[in-house]
């Protein structure tokens, strides 16, 4: 059975398009023995692009997140796709929003963490094999990626860069209140929409 990693639906009244990112971010899906290749991941940037292109300009996207993170390159691409979209993007953390998933949240116009949720920010890491020269080269590449990530987070953060870097060095778990104080989200909790009364 194919695992559904991202779910998309349209809420008819109000033209709100809901996307549920409820898995690790990955370029590749499951291995397909029939095609002898990987299926497209539903949490990849390529799949996300298709979802965003289907949303008319000016309408609203609700991006619900419950993810431990995943591929930095895919997550960064998703962040930029959100930035480019002319829809109004509301990011809502429903559970956990760790690592690159928290970067994706930063691409939304409005960033919300639900009550009892958590986020984690940390330095990038990678599993690498090779000789000493190759390992040093990979470390240099990580430094470049890390610098880009810090600058991305600083676009809206209200703390200074030194404090953000210290928090990432310490692999900090953020409560909604702490994230709000740091300017990394805009709001805690989602307001319940009133249902229209029927006489």
Residue ranges and their predicted role:
Residues 1-102, 107-199:
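N-terminal organellar transit peptides
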């Amino acid at each position: 059975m194919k695992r559904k990693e991202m779910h998309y639906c349209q809420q008819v009244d109000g033209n709100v398009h809901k996307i549920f990112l409820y898995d690790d971010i990955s370029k590749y899906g499951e291995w397909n023995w029939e095609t002898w290749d990987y299926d497209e991941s539903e949490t990849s940037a390529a799949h996300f692009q298709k979802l965003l292109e289907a949303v008319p300009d000016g309408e609203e996207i609700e991006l619900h997140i419950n993810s431990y993170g995943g591929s930095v390159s895919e997550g960064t691409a998703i962040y930029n796709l959100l930035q480019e979209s002319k829809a109004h993007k509301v990011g809502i953390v429903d559970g956990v929003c760790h690592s690159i998933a928290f970067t994706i949240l930063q691409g939304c116009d409005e960033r919300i963490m639900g009550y009892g949720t958590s986020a984690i920010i940390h330095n990038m890491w990678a599993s690498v094999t090779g000789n000493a020269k190759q390992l040093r080269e990979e470390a240099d590449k990580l430094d470049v990626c890390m610098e880009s990530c810090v600058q991305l987070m600083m676009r809206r953060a209200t703390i200074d860069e030194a404090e953000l870097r210290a928090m990432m060095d310490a692999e900090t778990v953020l409560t909604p209140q702490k994230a709000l104080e740091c300017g990394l989200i805009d709001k805690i909790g989602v307001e319940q929409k009133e249902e229209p009364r029927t006489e």
